[in-house]
A protein has these predicted regions:
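Non-catalytic substrate-recognition and accessory regions of acyl/acetyltransferase enzymes
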Residues: 2-137, 148-161, 165, 169-213
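Glycine-rich phosphate-binding loop
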Residues: 138-144
Length: 213
């Protein structure tokens, strides 16, 4: 497991102190209230310690942080909507789930996803990750969380297949993980680990593992 910190961050020392822990990294599914709480903590940390200065907003680092903040806002909105729908007696629709990656007590990455069979993509194998992001000061967490999600798909009987609707700036990163663009699409991508030679393999425990380079 390879996790590192970007040394070019504004306040790297603050986050490194939070993340350096003897506790084993944990990835687990969160209930809506806990997911909302953890997102708020992550957003507060980013706003207080990581937001770029006005002259940095257009560089790669600034765009990464701003994109992460916008994704968090979007996911928070989804959670609020789901909570309202669940309070309705006539609730029906896609059930989103939230899987988070923790180092010690700090959440460093999250995936918002749903099972395709229970959505408008019911005729498509796999699970769909609607949003996935990591703390802007951490590198390597996203691919580790994706590995976990591939095995989640496998355990659900979906052969490890993952679907995403990729942001343009994220397409290359998804390709490095083995995703391929769907036919007739410019953003919808699918990962089939069994067809991603040189990127994925199954270990002795029949778990999918990503071949990091």
């Amino acid at each position: 497991m390879k996790i590192g910190l970007y040394l070019s961050a504004h306040k790297t020392e603050v986050f490194s102190q939070q993340c350096e822990s003897n506790e084993k990294p944990i990835i687990r599914e969160l209930e809506l209230d806990e997911a909302q709480t953890e997102l708020e903590k992550l957003k507060t940390d980013i706003l207080n310690n990581w937001m770029p200065n006005s002259d940095e907003c257009e560089d790669v680092w600034g765009k990464k942080i701003i994109t992460t903040s916008l994704l968090i806002d979007g996911v928070e909105g989804h959670i609020q909507t789901q909570k309202q729908l669940r309070d309705s007696k006539n609730f029906s629709g896609t059930e989103h789930k939230y899987t988070a990656f923790f180092m010690g007590s700090s959440m460093i990455a999250m995936a918002e996803w749903y099972e395709n069979y229970n959505s408008y993509r019911y005729d498509t194998r796999g699970i769909t990750i609607e949003n996935i992001f990591s703390h802007p000061g951490v590198k390597g967490a996203g691919s580790i969380l994706m590995e976990y999600m591939v095995n989640t798909s496998e355990n659900l009987g979906e052969l490890g297949v993952i679907c995403v609707d990729a942001l343009e700036e994220a397409i290359k990163a998804y390709e490095q993980l083995g995703f391929k663009m769907d036919e007739y699409s410019s953003s919808q991508m699918t990962l089939t680990p069994s067809d991603s030679e040189g990127k994925w393999y199954k270990n002795k425990e029949s778990e999918w593992k990503f071949i990091s380079k």
